[in-house]
Amino acid sequence: MSKSYNNYIGLLDNAGILLKKVKQIPTDTKTVEEPKNPDECNVYQIVKHLINTGEDQILREKYFAGGLSYKYAKEYLYEKLSAFLLPLQERFAEISDDEVRKLLQEHSEKVNAIATRKIEEIYQKI
């Protein structure tokens, strides 16, 4: 996935964009019935970071056993990605621009005060 190709997964991608990007993840040409190696699958390489050990073991077994479609794997990835990103997206939506400006103003005043004291110390030592 590359930002240059606009196929990266953004933290704030809405459901439609996320689904489109997941569907575009390249896979090999093996049929549903054929066993697949999860370590060679782009979809698995992403989803393995979003699931627990038990889920990972079950998914790996499905890959090796055959019968796993890439459509299913991509839907599973989409489901896990959505669940992972939703809390972040909800929190982002809650934060208003005014809150951010207020926090930046408060902290910039604190930082300026500290920096001014440090600069004065340095001038006195020189």
Model region roles, listed by residue range:
Residues 1-126:
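Conserved nucleotide- and phosphate/pyrophosphate-binding catalytic cores
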